[in-house]
Amino acid sequence: MAAKKPVNWWLWTKMLLGGAAICVGGPAFTYWLTPTDEELFQKYNPELQKRSLERRFERQQEFDDFVTKLKEYSKSDKPIWTVQAEAEEKERQQRASVQKSLALADEVKARKEAMRREAGLPLEK
C-alpha cells in the first residue's frame, strides 16, 4: 500500500488567508473609496448646488409617489409590470376622456356665443 501524501498546511493557510482578504477587504475597500452624498454635493459647482437644492423636494415627492404606486401595484396577484401597464392605459383613457369633455365644453360655449351674436344679445365673458 502506498503512503498517503502529506497535507500541505502552508498552502491551505495561504489560500484561506488570501480568500478572507479578498472577501472582506474588497467590499471594505469599495466602502472606503465610495464618496458620501455630502462629499459629492460639495464637489458640484455653486450653480449646480443651487439647482439641486431647488429640485430636491420635487425629486423626493416623485420618488415617494413612485414607491407608493409600487406598493399599490404589488398588492395585486399579477406581475407589477402588467399592473403598471394597465394603470397607465387607464390613466391614458381618463386623460383622453377629459380632453374630449373639454373640447365638447368649448364647442358648446362657441355655439352659445354664436347664438347670442345672431340674436343680438351681449356676449358673456
From Swiss-Prot:
| Transmembrane residue ranges | 15-34
GO CC, sorted alphabetically, is: mitochondrial inner membrane; mitochondrial membrane
Q: Please give the coiled-coil regions recorded for this protein.
A: 98-118
Predominant localisation class: mitochondrion
- Give membrane topology per the record: Single-pass membrane protein
Q: Where in the cell is it found?
A: Mitochondrion inner membrane
Quote the InterPro entries the UniProt record gives.
Answer: Cbp4 (IPR012420)
> Which Pfam families does the protein's record reference?
CBP4
Give the record's GO biological process terms: mitochondrial respiratory chain complex III assembly
Keyword tags: Chaperone, Coiled coil, Membrane, Mitochondrion, Mitochondrion inner membrane, Transmembrane, Transmembrane helix
The similarity comment for this entry is: Belongs to the CBP4 family.
**Function field:** Essential for the assembly of ubiquinol-cytochrome c reductase. It has a direct effect on the correct occurrence of the Rieske protein, core 4, core 5 and apocytochrome b.
Q: What is the protein's given name?
A: Assembly factor cbp-4
Tell me the organism's taxonomic lineage. Eukaryota, Fungi, Dikarya, Ascomycota, Pezizomycotina
| This protein's encoding gene | cbp-4
